[in-house]
Amino acid sequence: MKIGVYGASGRIGKLLLEELKGGYKGLALSSVFVRQKCETDFSHFSHSPLVTNDLKAFVRACECVIDFSLPKGLDHLLEALLECPKILVSGTTGLEKETLEKMQQLALRVPLLHAHNMSLGIMMFNQLAFLASLKLKDADIEIVETHHNLKKDAPSGTALSLYETCAKARGYDEKNALTTHREGLRSKESIGIAALRGGDVAGKHTIGFYLEGEYIELSHTATNRSIFAKGALEVALWLKDKAAKKYEINEMFG
């Protein structure tokens, strides 16, 4: 399957190019979208990709787009994909309602998956969080996430996704149960998220389930950002023969 990388100058984009250099389980890099000059030397790649700032040409040259960009960039990409539908794997966070609506329109025509975190470990972490939230009905739930000091969004998209998983398991009102700034007593049907920023931490997420006399903590730590690139490529392989739909990352585990 021919892969197009959108957001190639970003941290994950560069890792995607590195993973695709020799081909990844039959995936071939066919196009790279760049707004400015690309620093990557493509002479060592198994296939010479189209490197362009022409969004329509970029989309036409591939069968699946993997996107790790910015919200406005993804919005422009979706407009091009609605004209020329291709499979989409997106890890861009902080999206506006209008962008999500365009994504839903595209999902009527092709398979796509949008996730805040593409690591296989986080996929399993979500399932464990759901089970613990469901079974430990009396436990207070608190989430702590830690990232590098250059991360722009807080709480992280992954932390918000974990919150949604826990709230759904509990049957909480997802719009009102979230607490990111607490003063005074803790309300019973609430889930807190604390965001820490410092150094070069790739990503750490911990969920605490606090009971009387004991507590359980589930934790996931990313020690290398390559897990996000490899995870996205695995998602692309999984979507290849799927029907048109917006898939959830947990569906990969059946």
Curated annotation (Swiss-Prot):
It catalyses: (S)-2,3,4,5-tetrahydrodipicolinate + NAD(+) + H2O = (2S,4S)-4-hydroxy-2,3,4,5-tetrahydrodipicolinate + NADH + H(+); (S)-2,3,4,5-tetrahydrodipicolinate + NADP(+) + H2O = (2S,4S)-4-hydroxy-2,3,4,5-tetrahydrodipicolinate + NADPH + H(+). Its EC number is 1.17.1.8. It comes from the Bacteria. NADP(+) binds at R35. InterPro entries: DapB_C, DapB_N, DapB_N_CS, DHDPR_bac, NAD(P)-bd_dom_sf. Pathway: Amino-acid biosynthesis; L-lysine biosynthesis via DAP pathway; (S)-tetrahydrodipicolinate from L-aspartate: step 4/4. Keywords: Amino-acid biosynthesis, Cytoplasm, Diaminopimelate biosynthesis, Lysine biosynthesis, NAD, NADP, Oxidoreductase. The active site is at H147, K151. (S)-2,3,4,5-tetrahydrodipicolinate binds at H148, G157, T158. It is found in: Cytoplasm. NAD(+) binds at G7, A8, S9, G10, R11, I12, G91, T92, T93, A115, H116, N117, M118. Its main location: cytoplasm. One of its GO terms (biological process) is diaminopimelate biosynthetic process. The keyword Cell membrane does not apply. NCBIfam families: dapB (TIGR00036). Belongs to the DapB family. This is 4-hydroxy-tetrahydrodipicolinate reductase. It comes from Helicobacter pylori (strain HPAG1).
